[in-house]
């Protein structure tokens, strides 16, 4: 039994509708699970801005990379929500595409350091409005270290595991 022709149907649907398509990838465990509590409001902001949104909660490490790589080309924009790691994973997946869509980011990690550096507004509603908006995209460099892309910080040496080994309740 053959499954539905998702790829062909997505292309036909895009040709027949004016709504823009967004893939929203969020990490349900980032920032003590805060994203899940704001999910409805975030998706509502996307809908009000004219986006037809597919929501995908990551299931494990590197899942955002896989989903962005496998599904990203079917969307006009990919927005991720989570910590700096979720942003890096999502960007890594999109970098594997020949024509990646724009990437938006809603910070929801323990420290949101990257979001602050990029001047993304605090609060899910304002960050979702920015991610769904039509403003000129911000360009920033993406580095690679040992063929692994990173969007914010790359570290090596004795203290690289400190962030991962620190319990979540101590990060805030």
Across the structure, where does each feature detected by a protein language model lie?
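Short Gly/Thr/Asp-enriched flexible loops that form oxyanion-binding sites at enzyme active sites
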Residues: 86-98
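ATP/NTP phosphate-donor binding region
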Residues: 2, 13-81, 136
């Amino acid at each position: 039994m053959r499954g539905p022709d998702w790829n062909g149907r997505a292309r036909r649907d895009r040709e027949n509708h004016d709504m823009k398509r967004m893939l929203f990838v969020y990490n349900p465990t980032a920032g003590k699970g805060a994203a899940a509590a704001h999910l409805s409001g975030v998706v509502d902001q996307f809908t009000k801005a004219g986006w037809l949104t597919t929501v995908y909660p990551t299931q494990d490490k590197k899942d955002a990379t896989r989903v962005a790589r496998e599904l990203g080309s079917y969307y006009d924009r990919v927005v991720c929500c989570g910590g700096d790691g979720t942003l890096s994973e999502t960007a890594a997946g999109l970098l594997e595409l020949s024509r990646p869509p724009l990437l938006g980011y809603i910070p929801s990690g323990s420290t949101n350091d990257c979001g602050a550096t990029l001047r993304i507004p605090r609060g899910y509603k304002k960050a979702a409005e920015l991610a769904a908006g039509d403003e000129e995209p911000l360009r920033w460099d993406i580095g690679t270290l040992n063929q692994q892309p990173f969007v914010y910080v790359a570290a090596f040496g004795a203290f690289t595991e400190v962030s991962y080994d620190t319990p979540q309740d101590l990060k805030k």
